[in-house]
UniProtKB/Swiss-Prot annotation:
This is Outer membrane protein assembly factor BamB. The lineage of its organism: Bacteria, Pseudomonadati, Pseudomonadota, Betaproteobacteria, Nitrosomonadales. Belongs to the BamB family. A lipid is attached at C35 (S-diacylglycerol cysteine). Residues 1-34 form the signal peptide. It comes from Nitrosomonas eutropha (strain DSM 101675 / C91 / Nm57).
Length: 409
C-alpha cells in the first residue's frame, strides 16, 4: 500500500537537487513501495508527505496580498468524516443525491442542498476506492480487492472480488461495472451480480507507480491511461482493445528517468479523448480511430478538463494552463496560486474553473483568461481529488475528512 503514496511525492523528488540524489531517493521509495501496508513505512500518512519545511513554497508579499484580497466563495454546508491516511476519496453526485465515503468504511448519502444525512452504512471494510455511482448503484472498493455494490436506499446488492487493491472509484455503464486495480489491471463485472465478464492487463514497464486514477466510459468504450505513457480504448461489453496510442514516450537512461505514467483520468468529449502524462506530454486523439490530433510538452499527475474551446491542465508547481483543444496551442497559463500542489480541475457554471490545493484552499479561476476570481479555505486538509458537481455549486473532500459544499448562485 506504500505504493499508493509514491506518485504523490515523485514531483517533489525530481526537484530534490542533483541527479544522483534523486536516483538514490527514488530507489529507496521503489523498494518501499513493495511493503504490505503503511505501517511498514513507520506509520506514515499521506499528510506527512506535504509537511516538510523544505517543500514549503516561498510566496512573495504581493502574491500574499493578492490572494488575501480575493472574494470568498459562498459556503453552503460542511460535514465531517474520518481522516484519510492512505486513500483519496471523491464525492459523487447522482440522481439528486450526494454520496461520500471514508477509509473507516462509512458510506453516507447526503442531501446536496443542506448536507443533511439521509442514511449511513457501516461496511466494516477498510475502503480504498470510491465513490462510484450510476444505474441505481453505489460502488466502493477495498484494499483487499473487494467491490461493494449498494442500491440508492443503502441496501447491499452484491460483493465481488478482484485480484488487487481497488484504489479508484468503480465506474458503471450499460450493465457493466469497470474496476481498476493499483497494478493497472482492468475488470468488467456484471452489474447485476458482480460476476467477472472480462479482464485486461497492459504490458507495463519494469518500473511503475500505483495511483488512484480510474477510467472514463463513453459511447460504449472504456478509456484508460497506463504506465509507459499509453492510452487505450476498450470495448465496454467485451474488454477487447479498440486502439492503443502513445501519449508520451519514455526518455532517459535509467528506468527512473524513463518513468512517464498517465496517472490521471482521460477526458472525453464528442469527438476526441485527451490525456496527460506525468513528466511527459499531453495529447488528444480522435475518439473512434485513435488518430492523434495534437501533442505538446506538459506534466501533470492531476489531469485535465475540457470544454467547447479549450483543455485545462493542472500542471506541476501550482500552475493551471489552458490550451486550444483543436491544436494544443497555449492560450494562457496561471501560477501564483499560493501552492505548488494542486488538485484536479473541474468546470463550473459562469465560465469558471475550480481547483483545490495542498493547503486546503479552493480557488475559482476565469476560464477565459486565467484570472483569479475567488478563494476560500476548508479545514486545512490537503485536497487531492477534483471537486464534484452540485446543482447550485460544487463540493470537495479533504484528507482530514472534511466535506465542504460551496454555492455559485
Amino acid at each position: 500500500m506504500a505504493g499508493n503514496i509514491l506518485l504523490l511525492i515523485l514531483d517533489y523528488v525530481f526537484h530534490a537537487g542533483s541527479r544522483t540524489l534523486r536516483v538514490c531517493i527514488l530507489s529507496l521509495l521503489i523498494l518501499l513501495s513493495g511493503c504490505a501496508n503503511l505501517s511498514d513505512l513507520g506509520g506514515g500518512h499521506l499528510t506527512d508527505l506535504f509537511s516538510s519545511e523544505e517543500d514549503e513554497v516561498e510566496i512573495d508579499e504581493a502574491e500574499i496580498v493578492a490572494l488575501q484580497t480575493l472574494a470568498p466563495i459562498n459556503p453552503l454546508w460542511q460535514v465531517k468524516l474520518a481522516e484519510s491516511k492512505t486513500a483519496v476519496f471523491l464525492p459523487v453526485y447522482d440522481n439528486g443525491a450526494l454520496y461520500v465515503a471514508d477509509e473507516d468504511g462509512r458510506l453516507v448519502k447526503l442531501d446536496p442542498v443542506t448536507g443533511r444525512e439521509i442514511w449511513r452504512v457501516e461496511t466494516k471494510s477498510q475502503l480504498s476506492g470510491g465513490v462510484g455511482a450510476g444505474g441505481g448503484m453505489i460502488l466502493l472498493g477495498t484494499y483487499k480487492g473487494e467491490v461493494l455494490a449498494f442500491d440508492e436506499a443503502g441496501n447491499a446488492l452484491w460483493q465481488s472480488r478482484v485480484p488487487g487493491e481497488v484504489l479508484s472509484p468503480p465506474k458503471t455503464d450499460s450493465g457493466i461495472v469497470v474496476v481498476r486495480t493499483g497494478d493497472s489491471k482492468l475488470f468488467g463485472l456484471n452489474a447485476t451480480d458482480g460476476k467477472r465478464i472480462w479482464s485486461y492487463q497492459s504490458v507495463t514497464p519494469p518500473l511503475t507507480v500505483r495511483s488512484f486514477v480510474g477510467v472514463s466510459i463513453t459511447r460504449g468504450a472504456v478509456f484508460a491511461g497506463f504506465p509507459g505513457g499509453k492510452l487505450i480504448a476498450l470495448d465496454l461489453l467485451t474488454g477487447n482493445v479498440g486502439w492503443e496510442e502513445t501519449v508520451s514516450q519514455p526518455h532517459g537512461v535509467t528506468e527512473l528517468e524513463r518513468m512517464t505514467d498517465i496517472s490521471s483520468l482521460p477526458i472525453v468529449d464528442e469527438n476526441q479523448v485527451c490525456a496527460v502524462a506525468y513528466r511527459g506530454r499531453a495529447a488528444c486523439f480522435e475518439i473512434s480511430s485513435g488518430n492523434q490530433i495534437w501533442a505538446r510538452d506538459a506534466s501533470s499527475s492531476m489531469g485535465m478538463v475540457i470544454d467547447n474551446h479549450h483543455v485545462y491542465i493542472s500542471e506541476e508547481h501550482g500552475i493551471v494552463a489552458a490550451y486550444d483543444k483543436s491544436s494544443g496551442t497555449a492560450v494562457w497559463k496561471r501560477g501564483k496560486l499560493g501552492s505548488r500542489k494542486l488538485s484536479g480541475l473541474m468546470i463550473v457554471r459562469g465560465n469558471r474553473l475550480v481547483v483545490g490545493d495542498d493547503q486546503g484552499f479552493v480557488t475559482l479561476i476565469n476560464r477565459q483568461d486565467g484570472s483569479l476570481l475567488a478563494r476560500s479555505p476548508t479545514d486545512g486538509g490537503i485536497i487531492l481529488s477534483r471537486a464534484e458537481y452540485l446543482p447550485d455549486g460544487f463540493v470537495v473532500q479533504t484528507l482530514k475528512g472534511g466535506v465542504f459544499a460551496f454555492s455559485l448562485q
